[in-house]
């Protein structure tokens, strides 16, 4: 029997670095349409776009997507997912996968992977993905979120800072990584149990989440387990800047 799960794609117009991002055209289609089409190639039983903007709503309706209007005042994307799950009436044990609306090249296989990861680990409220880091500059880049997990694959913590801090190596130089230390970059795709989403909303943000601007820290703060696997396929480039947009356009318009 195949695993049943729902994909939700949050899509908002407000972006400081790339205004109007979900509706920017790539190969003649809005960016969010590319994401939706990739998600539909996964094993998801349902793919829903969640937005708080009528222009996105109308664009998504035009290409045939299931789309829902949500409140505009959510603290995080996870809060938005909780609203969608409640509106759809999903049961507490249902699995919802959050696929970011700015990843038009997202591999469908890793959407399936993160859902299966959560289904295989009933002790976890969240599952997510990571990939190895091989370059020192990525370790020191605050836009690359680092993650450390325990021997069972459960997250210990996430940080924008270098994690772990290799004291002896970094005291001498920061252009080389220490041997035997598995640095990993977090991939911002999550699978959640709906029951967890309802709890998440009721808690509100914690100081650690706000300091790092990482909403998954709210879950760890409250003792929720997050299971992590390395992605079976390298995730494609997301679109955060005009340079990213041009790179993706070249790939899809070639």
Swiss-Prot record:
CDD domains: CMP-KDO-Synthetase. Its main location: cytoplasm. It catalyses: 3-deoxy-alpha-D-manno-oct-2-ulosonate + CTP = CMP-3-deoxy-beta-D-manno-octulosonate + diphosphate. GO terms for cellular component: cytosol. It is an enzyme of class 2 (transferase). It is found in: Cytoplasm. Pathway: Nucleotide-sugar biosynthesis; CMP-3-deoxy-D-manno-octulosonate biosynthesis; CMP-3-deoxy-D-manno-octulosonate from 3-deoxy-D-manno-octulosonate and CTP: step 1/1; Bacterial outer membrane biogenesis; lipopolysaccharide biosynthesis. Its EC number is 2.7.7.38. One of its GO terms (molecular function) is 3-deoxy-manno-octulosonate cytidylyltransferase activity. One of its GO terms (biological process) is lipopolysaccharide biosynthetic process. Gene3D superfamilies: Spore Coat Polysaccharide Biosynthesis Protein SpsA, Chain A (3.90.550.10). Keywords: Cytoplasm, Lipopolysaccharide biosynthesis, Nucleotidyltransferase, Transferase. It comes from the Bacteria. The keyword Protein transport does not apply. Pfam families: CTP_transf_3. The keyword Nucleotidyltransferase applies. Belongs to the KdsB family. Activates KDO (a required 8-carbon sugar) for incorporation into bacterial lipopolysaccharide in Gram-negative bacteria. This is 3-deoxy-manno-octulosonate cytidylyltransferase.
């Amino acid at each position: 029997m195949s695993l049943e799960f729902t994909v939700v794609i949050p899509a908002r117009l407000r972006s400081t670095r790339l205004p109007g991002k979900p509706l920017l055209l790539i190969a003649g289609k809005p960016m969010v349409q590319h994401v939706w089409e990739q998600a539909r190639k996964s094993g998801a039983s349902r793919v829903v776009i969640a937005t708080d903007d009528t222009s996105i709503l109308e664009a998504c309706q035009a290409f045939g997507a299931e789309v829902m209007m949500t409140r505009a005042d959510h603290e995080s994307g996870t809060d938005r997912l909780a609203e969608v799950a409640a509106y759809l009436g999903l049961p507490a044990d249902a699995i919802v996968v959050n696929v970011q609306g700015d990843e038009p090249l997202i591999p469908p296989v890793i959407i399936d992977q993160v859902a299966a990861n959560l289904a295989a680990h009933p002790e976890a409220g969240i599952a997510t993905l990571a990939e190895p880091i091989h370059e020192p500059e990525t370790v020191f880049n605050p836009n690359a979120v680092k993650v450390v997990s325990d021997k069972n694959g459960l997250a210990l913590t996430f940080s924008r800072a270098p994690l772990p801090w290799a004291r002896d190596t970094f005291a001498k130089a920061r252009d080389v990584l220490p041997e035997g230390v598995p640095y990993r970059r977090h991939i911002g795709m999550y699978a959640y149990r709906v029951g967890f989403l309802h709890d998440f909303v009721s808690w509100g943000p914690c100081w650690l989440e706000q300091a790092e601007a990482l909403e998954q820290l709210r879950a760890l703060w409250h003792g929720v387990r997050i299971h992590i696997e390395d992605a079976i396929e390298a995730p494609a480039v997301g679109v955060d800047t005009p340079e990213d947009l041009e790179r993706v356009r070249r790939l899809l318009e070639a």
